[in-house]
């Protein structure tokens, strides 16, 4: 029975860690860590959007 609890805890750990990799950039701190800048409108032509900074209105942009 203890083995089942251990395996269940390991499964939750793996699934919670995996969800972090699929989120992308979602706040200003992670934007800067990913070498991006927060832009209140759309990204300029020489940059691509890698996420959002605050809500959906402010984009996180990085050079292509």
UniProtKB/Swiss-Prot annotation:
Taking the record's annotation, the residue ranges forming a coiled coil are none
Top-level taxon: Eukaryota
| GO BP, sorted A to Z | cell chemotaxis; defense response to bacterium
* Record's keyword annotation contains Magnesium: no
Identify the InterPro entries for this entry: Beta/alpha-defensin_C, Defensin_beta-like
Chief subcellular site? secreted
> Which Gene Ontology cellular component terms are annotated?
extracellular space
One MF term from GO for this chain? chemoattractant activity
The tissues where this chain's protein is expressed are given as: Tracheal epithelium.
Q: Where in the cell is it found?
A: Secreted
Tell me which Gene3D superfamilies the record gives: Antimicrobial Peptide, Beta-defensin 2, Chain A
List cystine links: 31-60, 38-53, 43-61
Task: Show which residues constitute the signal peptide.
Answer: 1-26
The alphabetical list of record keywords is: Antibiotic, Antimicrobial, Defensin, Disulfide bond, Secreted, Signal
**What family does this belong to?**
Belongs to the beta-defensin family. LAP/TAP subfamily.
User: What's the stated role of this polypeptide?
Assistant: Has antibacterial activity in vitro against Escherichia coli, Staphylococcus aureus, Klebsiella pneumonia, and Pseudomonas aeruginosa. In addition, the peptide is active against Candida albicans, indicating a broad spectrum of activity.
Q: This protein is called what?
A: Tracheal antimicrobial peptide
């Amino acid at each position: 029975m203890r083995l089942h609890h251990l395996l269940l805890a390991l499964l939750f750990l793996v699934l919670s860690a995996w969800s972090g990799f699929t989120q992308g950039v979602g706040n200003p701190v992670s934007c800067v860590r990913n070498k991006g800048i927060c832009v209140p409108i759309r990204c300029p032509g020489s940059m691509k959007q890698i996420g959002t900074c605050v809500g959906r209105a402010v984009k996180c942009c990085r050079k292509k």
